[in-house]
A protein has these predicted regions:
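Active-site proximal loop and beta-alpha junction motif in alpha/beta enzyme cores
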Residues: 1-151
Length: 151
């Protein structure tokens, strides 16, 4: 799928971030969402964030990420402001997470793993036009019919 990227600005790491995630990030950036960067993959995988404290952080989605051991990065996306405790695999968040790691690792193609309970791989390609292609396996979670009256 073809998505936009968003400008990212480094922001100060705060005590509120540490309280929300239970671990102090080593770096934080803000775009449409907040991305807190942690020291290692294990910290991201094992964290048990405080959903109420996450509500106090900037951005609509609160992301935790670290450089991966077998992938370029590992992440988790928490969305209490959207009434979603944790998004299993968040394409919208990776518009920013992959862009961040692309710059950090100096590469255009990023393989990301979202370490939620369900988990999933995202294959991200940063384009020169400021957009990103994201692919991966999708999981069908609902089927519905929409009924509309046409006049």
């Amino acid at each position: 799928m073809d998505f936009p990227t968003y400008p990212l600005t480094e922001i100060s790491v705060t005590d509120a971030m540490e309280q929300a995630f239970g671990i102090r990030p080593v770096k934080a950036v803000l775009g449409l969402d907040i991305i807190c960067v942690f020291e290692n993959e294990e910290q991201v995988r094992q964290m048990q964030p405080d959903q109420a404290m996450l509500m106090n952080l900037e951005g609509r989605i609160q992301n935790a990420t670290a450089q991966g051991m077998e992938t370029d990065c590992v992440s988790r996306s928490f969305c209490p402001k959207l009434s979603i405790a944790e998004d299993p695999v968040c394409g919208a968040a990776h518009c920013q997470i992959a862009d961040y790691w692309s710059k950090e690792l100096n590469k255009k193609q990023i393989v990301a793993y979202q370490a939620s309970r369900r988990g999933g791989y995202l294959y991200c390609e940063l384009r020169d036009d400021g957009r990103i292609n994201i692919s991966g396996k999708a999981v069908l979670v609902a089927i519905t019919d929409i009924v509309a009256e046409l006049s």
